[in-house]
Each structure stands twice: as structure tokens, then as C-alpha cells.
Amino acid sequence: MTNYKTDFEALRKQLSAKPVDPEKLITPDPTPNTQRLWEYLKSCYGKKFISGQQYLWEDEKEDLVYWNTTGKIPAIRGYDFMGISGLARGYDQLGRALDWARRTGGILTMCWHWNAPDDMEDIAKECSFYYKTTNYDHKTGFDIVRVMQEGTPEHDFVIYEIDLVASALKMFEQADIPVLWRPLHEAAGNWFWWGNRAEAGKQDPESVEAYKKLWYTIFDRFMNLHKLRNLIWVWNGQAPFMAVDPNTFDIAGEDIYDEIPNHGSQLERFRGVSSYTHGKMITLSECGSIPEPDEMLRDGATWLWWLPWWGSFVYDTDDKWHAVLDDNGMPRPNPKYMDEAFMKRIFSDPRVVTLEDLPWYDKQKKPLPYALHQRLRKKYGKETGI
């Protein structure tokens, strides 16, 4: 671990003195592929909607649902750094993310469900990204305020992990793969250890300030120490009181899960995040339900992409969260969030960008994701030509 330290006062002064330009990446010298992706995102904004999907399990059943229903798969693929440190074994997704981007040329977005120990004296005992005040089975008392106090074991832990993630992202840069990078998501909520510790709708100034310092620490180390050039930064703070300097992110994200699923435009939420993010493009960085393109365009709630969560948000499951299979042994759409007719209509809409619609996608090679390729070959045989 390097002795590099972030000078917060100097960094904030430097950032605030710089004009905000939503048209330009905050990375001063991005890789050519990163710049190309940025220009493409800008060309879509307000006119088209890029389809996305978050993944967890290695079999990636979500693809089977999309492919068998529509003959297409989403253009953006969401993966997670949650398993990078070894505290949450079995959740390492980096190899899959790298393989998918290399094979298909699809767009990657990466979040970080950051597992942290409950007991710094016995870090293997219990870890979680959920804070101790939640009702989840696994949770942590890892303290965001102590995290930002130099000399504490919590501080040393996060600096080590930040640099570990930077090394992984450098691997993507060396492979010429840009990443839509979304750390410290949903920070206004009190369910993650890095977030606001107050009750819903309120704010705890101490934890809010610590969160902002943690954001600036990640930004500073990635940008100025590790000099990563392949990132498009997505800020997902979810409230104006959590806002960080606009010169530290390129796109603003909002995560929306309604108690009753609906396909409305989410105009109120779109307007809300637009009001405090300085003209940055706005995206639906996580969702339970995909909005209707007609409604988004009618209302002017032109989310750049959408990203349904994994598992039962896409395919039907039983009471033990196992996929319910159809007569062909394949997972089927979950009608609670999107039935077969809705999925077909959305993925055939010319305003919706799927993987094959990306301008650099090679339609001759048809490089399906590996897990989907293997499952289809096993089920239908070589005669399909897949």
C-alpha cells in the first residue's frame, strides 16, 4: 500500500475552480475506445434507450430468457466487484466481465457491493455491505466515519481495497475495454455501510461528509495515482444532500424499485436527479421495471439506459428462488416485472439499442456470451449453427 494521501481541501478547491462541461469526459486523456463509447452514449441520449441487464450467477439465465423470447440480448451488461477481496467467496465476476466484453464488444457497467468486516480484529468472521441497522441476515457495523480517520484499521482496509479494484480496472484498460464505473451506489439510503446513517428522508451530517470524502478518495486515487483512463464515472448518490462535485462524474444514475412494478416513465425521479447534477446525462442505473419508450419520450424522461436487477426481476422463480422452467427446460419471463409480450415489444422497438445494434458489433461473428452459447448448444445441439 502506497503512502499516497488525498488532500481534500486542495482537491475540492481545484475541482470547484474548473468549469463544468457535461459534453466532455472528466478524464482528461481517455483511451480512444472510452472516448468512442462516450460519443456514442451522447448520440443516443434523448433519442434512443440502451438496454441493459445486471448479472450475478454464472449460468446467467437472464440471457436465456431474453434470447428465447426475443432473439436478442441487452447491449449493456452489469457486473459487480463484490467478491474481489475474498471476503465474499464465490462471487468473483471479473473474469466473466472481461470475457464478455472481449467476445462481444458489448458495454460494461460495474458496481461495487463492497463487503467490509463487522469486526476488524477478526475480518473473516462476518462481512457484508449491508449496515447493522438493516434487517438482513448478514450485516456489518463497519463505520464510515472511522473509515475516513487516518490511522484506523478501517481506513487502512478501504485504501487497500480501493487500490485492489484499481488494479483490476487497469486490467480492463490494458485490454482496451472501457467501463461505466458506478461505485458507492444508493448512498442517500441507510442500508449500505458507506451511506447516510439517518432515517429515510433525513440526513446525518457526519456520515454524509465521510461518504463524500470516500468518494473523493476513490476518485483521486483512480485518477491521479493509478491514472486510469478507461472509466466513465457514474454517480448514484440519490439525493441533493449527497451531491459531490460534478467534475468527479460523467453521468448521474438513479436506482428505482417500486413496490408495485410499473412501466411508467418515472418522470418525477428523472426531474429530481436532473435538478442537482449540472446538466449531466441521466441514467436508470438499476430498476425493477423497464419504462415504456413511448412514455419516456412523451414525458421527456429520457433515461440513457436501463438496468433491471438479476434473477426474479427477469425470470420466474419458485418460493426457494429457483428458476421456474418451461416445457423445454428453459427459464421463462416473470410476468410480475415484464411478461413475454412486453419483452418482445420492447426489444423489437427501433429506439431500443440491443447488443447487435451497437455500431461496432460484428454481426458476422455472432459472438454470443459464453454461458448462453454453451446452454443453447447443450439444449438444441450443433445443428442450430450457434
Which residues fall in each region the model found?
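Aromatic- and acid-rich polysaccharide-binding/catalytic face
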Residues: A239-P261, W309
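Aromatic-lined carbohydrate-recognition surfaces of secreted/lumenal glycan-active proteins
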Residues: G52-Q54, R182-L184, W215-F241, G279-I290
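Catalytic domains of carbohydrate-active enzymes, especially glycoside hydrolases
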Residues: E58-L87, D92-W112
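N-terminal regions that are enriched for targeting/export leaders
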Residues: T2-M82
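Loop/turn elements at helix/coil->beta-strand transitions in domains of secreted/extracellular proteins
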Residues: G46-F49, K72-A75, R103-L108, Q174-L180, ...
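Alpha-helical scaffolding within the catalytic cores
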Residues: R36, E58-Y66, D92-G95, L164-S167, ...
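Substrate-binding cleft of extracellular glycoside hydrolase catalytic domains
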Residues: L87, L94-T217, L228
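Substrate-binding cleft of secreted/luminal carbohydrate-active enzymes
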Residues: N3-P22, Y45-W57, K280-I386
